[in-house]
Structures are given as structure tokens and as C-alpha cells.
């Protein structure tokens, strides 16, 4: 199964935003499906749990799949996927999540939280990435402290034997922190600032990634 796994340094760093853009970009030349195998903090609407991130990913795709296929495990508790599944009485396993990611098309998989966030019994996001054997797009929010977050995440990924295709510095607000320059002094991983002024460069690098997947 070919695809990319979107992970990050934590929650609310822009994984879904970057994943949406990747899906739309790749959909110009490929059939692309999206998977968010488990999502916590889902909104309860009349007894039905609504996975907000998964819905955004689904809308970005050029193929129409049921939301239950995009996100198989929807959880209400606002906590890690592991704890939220326990709160709901669900005994979620790594094998369950691997199966929930399967697709016949090129697939963009978005994890929950950071690389080492627990997502099932005795399983972290890094374990799911290993099981899927996918390269990682690592999203870091471009803010004060991003250098530390990036290097910690890179070290974690490498210690788990994961392949990082690209590190994305998600620049939500323009700044002059020069985080990309600082990170480049400590790693050979491809680093890309993600904002409206750097989209052409981002797209070129994504196309290069596709050549080696």
C-alpha cells in the first residue's frame, strides 16, 4: 500500500491542514484516499459522533468514500486515543488500526497527537507507522520552541527506524524566528516552511517524494 503518514510534534500543530493540502495537490495526478483510523474529541450530534478532522480530509479527496471508512473509530472523550477508547469500553488494538488504514488507492493517513502519542493498547503512533511501513511527513508548528520540538521528534522517529520524507514548519502567522535555518544546522532532513509564500517550493518537494515512494 502506497501512501504518506502525517504526524507531528503534538496536537494542534496543523496536521489536518497540511494533510488537506497534500490530498488536493496529489489528487491532480492520483486517486487519493484519506484515513484517520481513530479520532477522539468527536462531537456528539443526536447520538452520532462526528469526526471533525476526518470530515475535512474526506472533503479534500477526489474519490467518495463513506466517513466510516475514512475514520473507523470515533471517540467522544477529549483525551489520547488510547484513553478515549478505554473510556468508551473499546479494546482497540494496533491490528485494528492497521486494518482501518487499508486502501486500494494512494492513501494519506493522519495520526492523532504526536509520534509517541498512545493510540491503542500498548501501541503508539510510531508503532502504527512501522506496521504500515510508510514514510512520514512531520508537521511542526513554526513558533518559539519549534527547534526543540523538531529535533525531539526527529530523534524519536529515527530511534524507531522511521523514514521522514519531509519536515513541515507550519507557519500559521508570519514570523522572523528563522527556525528552518536553525533546524537545518542539526539534520539533513528536508525542511519546508509551509505558508502562502512557499507553496511552489512545497509542491516541488512533494512531487520529488512521490518518485521514491
From Swiss-Prot:
Which sites bind substrate? Answer: 40
The UniProt entry, under CDD domains, shows: DTBS
One Pfam family recorded for the sequence: AAA_26
Q: Which GO terms describe its biological process?
A: biotin biosynthetic process
Pathway-wise, it operates in:
Cofactor biosynthesis; biotin biosynthesis; biotin from 7,8-diaminononanoate: step 1/2
* Annotated residues for binding of ATP: 12-17, 53, 110-113, 170-171
* Required cofactor(s): Mg(2+)
Binding-site list for Mg(2+): 16, 53, 110
Q: Could you give the subunit structure recorded for this chain?
A: Homodimer.
Q: What does this protein do?
A: Catalyzes a mechanistically unusual reaction, the ATP-dependent insertion of CO2 between the N7 and N8 nitrogen atoms of 7,8-diaminopelargonic acid (DAPA, also called 7,8-diammoniononanoate) to form a ureido ring.
Which protein are we looking at?
ATP-dependent dethiobiotin synthetase BioD
